[in-house]
Protein backbone atom coordinates (compact mmCIF):
# COMPACT_ATOMS: atom_id res chain seq x y z
CA UNK A 1 0.00 0.00 0.00
CA UNK A 2 1.31 3.46 -0.87
CA UNK A 3 2.37 5.84 1.88
CA UNK A 4 1.08 9.41 1.77
CA UNK A 5 4.51 10.63 0.60
CA UNK A 6 4.48 8.11 -2.27
CA UNK A 7 0.96 9.14 -3.25
CA UNK A 8 1.97 12.81 -3.21
CA UNK A 9 4.95 12.01 -5.45
CA UNK A 10 2.62 10.32 -7.96
CA UNK A 11 0.33 13.37 -7.86
CA UNK A 12 3.33 15.65 -8.45
CA UNK A 13 4.37 13.65 -11.51
CA UNK A 14 0.85 13.72 -12.95
CA UNK A 15 0.55 17.46 -12.29
CA UNK A 16 3.84 18.13 -14.07
CA UNK A 17 2.64 16.08 -17.05
CA UNK A 18 -0.75 17.81 -17.35
CA UNK A 19 0.31 20.90 -19.38
CA UNK A 20 2.25 18.69 -21.77
CA UNK A 21 -0.74 16.38 -22.24
CA UNK A 22 -2.93 19.41 -22.97
CA UNK A 23 -0.36 20.84 -25.36
CA UNK A 24 0.23 17.68 -27.39
CA UNK A 25 -3.24 16.11 -27.51
CA UNK A 26 -4.10 15.47 -31.16
CA UNK A 27 -0.49 15.94 -32.26
CA UNK A 28 1.58 13.46 -34.28
CA UNK A 29 4.78 12.15 -32.68
CA UNK A 30 7.14 10.03 -34.81
CA UNK A 31 9.39 7.77 -32.74
CA UNK A 32 12.34 5.83 -34.13
CA UNK A 33 12.82 2.70 -32.00
CA UNK A 34 16.34 1.28 -32.06
CA UNK A 35 19.54 0.57 -30.16
CA UNK A 36 19.64 -1.13 -26.76
CA UNK A 37 15.94 -0.48 -26.27
CA UNK A 38 15.20 -3.13 -28.90
CA UNK A 39 17.21 -5.92 -27.27
CA UNK A 40 16.55 -5.40 -23.54
CA UNK A 41 13.27 -6.90 -22.29
CA UNK A 42 12.66 -4.23 -19.64
CA UNK A 43 13.32 -1.43 -22.13
CA UNK A 44 11.09 -3.08 -24.75
CA UNK A 45 8.19 -3.22 -22.32
CA UNK A 46 8.67 0.33 -21.04
CA UNK A 47 8.77 1.59 -24.63
CA UNK A 48 5.54 -0.24 -25.49
CA UNK A 49 3.79 1.18 -22.42
CA UNK A 50 5.01 4.68 -23.31
CA UNK A 51 3.52 4.39 -26.80
CA UNK A 52 0.21 3.07 -25.46
CA UNK A 53 -0.02 5.87 -22.89
CA UNK A 54 0.67 8.50 -25.55
CA UNK A 55 -2.22 7.12 -27.59
CA UNK A 56 -4.54 6.98 -24.58
CA UNK A 57 -3.99 10.68 -23.76
CA UNK A 58 -4.85 11.70 -27.30
CA UNK A 59 -1.54 11.78 -29.18
CA UNK A 60 -0.89 9.99 -32.47
CA UNK A 61 2.37 8.03 -32.11
CA UNK A 62 3.98 6.62 -35.26
CA UNK A 63 6.74 4.05 -34.70
CA UNK A 64 9.59 3.45 -37.16
CA UNK A 65 12.07 0.75 -36.16
CA UNK A 66 15.52 -0.49 -37.04
CA UNK A 67 16.97 -3.95 -36.57
CA UNK A 68 20.64 -3.98 -37.57
CA UNK A 69 21.87 -6.31 -34.79
CA UNK A 70 19.06 -8.78 -35.45
CA UNK A 71 19.88 -8.77 -39.18
CA UNK A 72 23.54 -9.38 -38.36
CA UNK A 73 22.65 -12.30 -36.07
CA UNK A 74 20.57 -14.08 -38.71
CA UNK A 75 23.15 -13.51 -41.45
CA UNK A 76 25.74 -15.08 -39.17
CA UNK A 77 23.51 -18.10 -38.50
CA UNK A 78 23.00 -18.53 -42.25
CA UNK A 79 26.75 -18.12 -42.93
CA UNK A 80 26.16 -15.09 -45.14
CA UNK A 81 29.06 -12.68 -44.93
CA UNK A 82 28.42 -9.00 -44.26
CA UNK A 83 30.48 -5.99 -45.26
CA UNK A 84 29.96 -2.28 -44.73
CA UNK A 85 30.71 0.86 -46.74
CA UNK A 86 30.61 4.14 -44.83
CA UNK A 87 28.55 2.47 -42.11
CA UNK A 88 25.99 1.01 -44.54
CA UNK A 89 25.51 -2.72 -44.97
CA UNK A 90 26.28 -3.93 -48.50
CA UNK A 91 23.01 -5.64 -49.40
CA UNK A 92 23.01 -8.21 -52.20
CA UNK A 93 19.90 -10.24 -53.07
CA UNK A 94 20.52 -12.91 -50.43
CA UNK A 95 21.13 -10.30 -47.75
CA UNK A 96 18.02 -8.38 -48.81
CA UNK A 97 15.94 -11.53 -48.31
CA UNK A 98 17.24 -11.71 -44.74
CA UNK A 99 16.60 -7.98 -44.19
CA UNK A 100 12.97 -8.42 -45.25
CA UNK A 101 12.54 -11.48 -43.03
CA UNK A 102 13.97 -9.72 -39.99
CA UNK A 103 12.61 -6.18 -40.39
CA UNK A 104 9.27 -6.95 -42.03
CA UNK A 105 8.73 -10.18 -40.14
CA UNK A 106 10.35 -10.93 -36.81
CA UNK A 107 11.17 -7.46 -35.46
CA UNK A 108 8.07 -5.68 -36.76
CA UNK A 109 5.70 -8.28 -35.37
CA UNK A 110 7.51 -8.37 -32.01
CA UNK A 111 6.97 -4.63 -31.60
CA UNK A 112 3.33 -4.86 -32.71
CA UNK A 113 2.75 -7.71 -30.25
CA UNK A 114 4.40 -5.78 -27.40
CA UNK A 115 2.22 -2.73 -27.96
CA UNK A 116 -0.93 -4.83 -28.27
CA UNK A 117 -0.14 -6.82 -25.10
CA UNK A 118 0.12 -3.54 -23.23
CA UNK A 119 -3.34 -2.42 -24.29
CA UNK A 120 -2.67 -0.67 -27.59
CA UNK A 121 -3.87 -1.41 -31.12
CA UNK A 122 -0.84 -1.52 -33.40
CA UNK A 123 -0.58 -2.60 -37.02
CA UNK A 124 2.77 -3.39 -38.63
CA UNK A 125 3.62 -2.43 -42.20
CA UNK A 126 6.69 -2.22 -44.39
CA UNK A 127 7.29 0.46 -46.98
CA UNK A 128 6.06 -2.00 -49.62
CA UNK A 129 2.54 -2.07 -48.17
CA UNK A 130 0.39 0.38 -50.11
CA UNK A 131 3.58 1.77 -51.67
CA UNK A 132 4.16 3.54 -48.36
CA UNK A 133 7.87 4.16 -49.03
CA UNK A 134 8.82 4.80 -52.64
CA UNK A 135 12.58 4.33 -52.76
CA UNK A 136 15.48 4.83 -55.11
CA UNK A 137 18.85 3.17 -55.10
CA UNK A 138 21.45 4.93 -52.96
CA UNK A 139 24.73 5.65 -54.70
CA UNK A 140 27.93 6.07 -52.73
CA UNK A 141 30.67 8.29 -54.08
CA UNK A 142 34.10 7.76 -52.60
CA UNK A 143 37.21 9.73 -53.47
CA UNK A 144 40.14 7.64 -54.65
CA UNK A 145 43.43 9.28 -53.61
CA UNK A 146 45.33 7.29 -56.24
CA UNK A 147 43.58 8.94 -59.17
CA UNK A 148 42.31 12.11 -57.43
CA UNK A 149 38.77 11.34 -58.52
CA UNK A 150 35.52 9.95 -57.15
CA UNK A 151 34.37 6.40 -57.75
CA UNK A 152 30.80 5.15 -57.47
CA UNK A 153 30.48 2.14 -55.18
CA UNK A 154 27.55 -0.25 -55.65
CA UNK A 155 26.22 -1.33 -52.25
CA UNK A 156 23.30 -3.30 -53.66
CA UNK A 157 19.76 -3.02 -52.32
CA UNK A 158 20.40 0.01 -50.13
CA UNK A 159 18.02 2.85 -50.82
CA UNK A 160 16.92 6.31 -49.88
CA UNK A 161 13.42 7.71 -49.59
CA UNK A 162 11.98 9.18 -52.76
CA UNK A 163 8.44 9.78 -51.48
CA UNK A 164 6.19 8.77 -48.57
CA UNK A 165 2.56 7.84 -49.31
CA UNK A 166 0.97 9.46 -46.27
CA UNK A 167 -2.51 8.15 -47.13
CA UNK A 168 -1.48 4.71 -45.81
CA UNK A 169 -0.54 6.22 -42.45
CA UNK A 170 -3.64 8.45 -42.40
CA UNK A 171 -5.94 5.43 -42.87
CA UNK A 172 -4.36 3.67 -39.89
CA UNK A 173 -4.30 6.73 -37.62
CA UNK A 174 -7.87 7.71 -38.52
CA UNK A 175 -8.95 4.17 -37.62
CA UNK A 176 -7.28 4.62 -34.20
CA UNK A 177 -4.39 2.24 -34.88
CA UNK A 178 -0.73 2.80 -34.02
CA UNK A 179 1.37 2.32 -37.21
CA UNK A 180 4.63 0.40 -36.78
CA UNK A 181 6.79 0.87 -39.88
CA UNK A 182 9.68 -1.31 -41.06
CA UNK A 183 12.16 0.71 -43.18
CA UNK A 184 11.94 -1.30 -46.39
CA UNK A 185 11.18 0.68 -49.53
CA UNK A 186 10.08 -0.31 -53.01
CA UNK A 187 11.64 1.00 -56.22
CA UNK A 188 10.11 1.83 -59.60
CA UNK A 189 10.95 -1.69 -60.76
CA UNK A 190 9.38 -3.35 -57.71
CA UNK A 191 12.75 -4.13 -56.12
CA UNK A 192 13.08 -3.95 -52.34
CA UNK A 193 15.49 -1.55 -50.68
CA UNK A 194 16.94 -1.48 -47.18
CA UNK A 195 16.76 2.11 -45.87
CA UNK A 196 18.26 3.65 -42.75
CA UNK A 197 15.49 3.80 -40.13
CA UNK A 198 16.48 7.29 -38.94
CA UNK A 199 16.06 8.60 -42.48
CA UNK A 200 12.65 6.96 -42.84
CA UNK A 201 11.51 8.36 -39.48
CA UNK A 202 12.68 11.82 -40.50
CA UNK A 203 10.89 11.71 -43.85
CA UNK A 204 7.69 10.38 -42.28
CA UNK A 205 7.81 13.22 -39.74
CA UNK A 206 8.34 15.76 -42.55
CA UNK A 207 5.44 14.49 -44.67
CA UNK A 208 3.08 14.40 -41.68
CA UNK A 209 4.41 17.76 -40.39
CA UNK A 210 4.73 16.07 -37.02
CA UNK A 211 4.93 17.91 -33.73
CA UNK A 212 7.99 15.87 -32.74
CA UNK A 213 10.56 13.49 -34.19
CA UNK A 214 12.14 11.35 -31.47
CA UNK A 215 15.24 9.24 -32.18
CA UNK A 216 16.20 6.68 -29.53
CA UNK A 217 19.98 6.18 -29.24
CA UNK A 218 22.55 4.45 -27.04
CA UNK A 219 23.93 7.74 -25.72
CA UNK A 220 22.65 10.35 -23.27
CA UNK A 221 22.17 12.88 -26.07
CA UNK A 222 24.33 15.12 -28.21
CA UNK A 223 27.52 16.02 -26.33
CA UNK A 224 29.97 18.90 -26.64
CA UNK A 225 33.74 18.37 -26.85
CA UNK A 226 34.01 18.15 -23.05
CA UNK A 227 31.42 15.38 -22.88
CA UNK A 228 28.58 17.50 -21.50
CA UNK A 229 25.11 16.79 -22.88
CA UNK A 230 23.68 19.69 -24.88
CA UNK A 231 20.04 19.73 -23.82
CA UNK A 232 18.68 22.41 -26.15
CA UNK A 233 19.91 23.57 -29.56
CA UNK A 234 18.65 25.64 -32.48
CA UNK A 235 19.18 24.47 -36.05
CA UNK A 236 21.73 27.24 -36.54
CA UNK A 237 23.76 26.07 -33.56
CA UNK A 238 23.68 22.48 -34.83
CA UNK A 239 25.08 23.67 -38.18
CA UNK A 240 27.92 25.35 -36.27
CA UNK A 241 28.66 22.20 -34.27
CA UNK A 242 28.85 20.17 -37.48
CA UNK A 243 31.16 22.74 -39.07
CA UNK A 244 33.57 22.82 -36.10
CA UNK A 245 33.75 19.02 -35.80
CA UNK A 246 31.87 18.64 -32.51
CA UNK A 247 29.34 16.44 -34.30
CA UNK A 248 31.07 13.73 -36.31
CA UNK A 249 31.20 10.00 -37.01
CA UNK A 250 28.19 7.82 -36.29
CA UNK A 251 26.21 10.65 -34.71
CA UNK A 252 26.43 12.84 -37.83
CA UNK A 253 23.82 11.01 -39.98
CA UNK A 254 21.37 10.90 -37.05
CA UNK A 255 21.78 14.61 -36.30
CA UNK A 256 21.57 15.51 -40.00
CA UNK A 257 18.28 13.62 -40.23
CA UNK A 258 16.89 15.47 -37.20
CA UNK A 259 18.16 18.79 -38.53
CA UNK A 260 16.57 18.28 -41.96
CA UNK A 261 13.24 17.35 -40.37
CA UNK A 262 13.10 20.53 -38.28
CA UNK A 263 14.16 22.70 -41.22
CA UNK A 264 11.32 21.12 -43.23
CA UNK A 265 8.58 21.96 -40.74
CA UNK A 266 8.72 19.41 -37.92
CA UNK A 267 8.30 21.43 -34.71
CA UNK A 268 11.13 19.74 -32.80
CA UNK A 269 13.51 16.79 -32.95
CA UNK A 270 14.79 14.90 -29.93
CA UNK A 271 17.88 12.72 -29.59
CA UNK A 272 17.06 10.70 -26.48
CA UNK A 273 18.74 8.05 -24.37
CA UNK A 274 16.96 4.81 -25.17
CA UNK A 275 18.82 3.04 -22.36
CA UNK A 276 16.65 4.89 -19.82
CA UNK A 277 13.33 3.15 -19.02
CA UNK A 278 10.35 5.24 -20.17
CA UNK A 279 12.69 7.64 -21.99
CA UNK A 280 9.93 8.66 -24.41
CA UNK A 281 7.53 9.71 -21.64
CA UNK A 282 10.27 11.47 -19.70
CA UNK A 283 11.21 13.53 -22.74
CA UNK A 284 7.63 14.50 -23.58
CA UNK A 285 6.05 14.92 -20.16
CA UNK A 286 8.77 16.32 -17.87
CA UNK A 287 10.51 19.67 -17.66
CA UNK A 288 14.03 18.19 -17.69
CA UNK A 289 13.76 15.52 -20.41
CA UNK A 290 16.41 12.89 -21.15
CA UNK A 291 18.29 14.04 -24.22
CA UNK A 292 18.88 16.81 -26.73
CA UNK A 293 16.09 18.98 -28.13
CA UNK A 294 16.55 20.62 -31.55
CA UNK A 295 14.21 23.40 -32.67
CA UNK A 296 14.11 25.95 -35.45
CA UNK A 297 15.56 29.34 -34.56
CA UNK A 298 12.22 31.03 -35.09
CA UNK A 299 10.32 28.66 -32.80
CA UNK A 300 12.90 28.00 -30.08
UniProtKB/Swiss-Prot annotation:
Its main location: cytoplasm. One of its GO terms (cellular component) is cytoplasm. The record marks 32, 254 as: Transition state stabilizer. It is found in: Cytoplasm. CDD domains: AAK_NAGK-C. The keyword Amino-acid biosynthesis applies. GO terms for molecular function: acetylglutamate kinase activity; ATP binding. It comes from the Bacteria. It catalyses: N-acetyl-L-glutamate + ATP = N-acetyl-L-glutamyl 5-phosphate + ADP. The keyword Translocase does not apply. Pfam families: AA_kinase. Catalyzes the ATP-dependent phosphorylation of N-acetyl-L-glutamate. Belongs to the acetylglutamate kinase family. ArgB subfamily. This is Acetylglutamate kinase.
Amino acid sequence: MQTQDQALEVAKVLTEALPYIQRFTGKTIVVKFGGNAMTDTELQNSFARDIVLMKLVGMNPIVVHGGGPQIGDLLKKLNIESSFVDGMRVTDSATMDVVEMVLGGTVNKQIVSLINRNGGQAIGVTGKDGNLIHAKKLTVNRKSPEVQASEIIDIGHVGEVKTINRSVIDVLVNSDFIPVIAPIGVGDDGASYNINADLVAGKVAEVLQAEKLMLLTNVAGLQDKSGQVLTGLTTGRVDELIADGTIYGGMLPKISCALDAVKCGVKSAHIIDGRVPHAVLLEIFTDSGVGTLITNEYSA
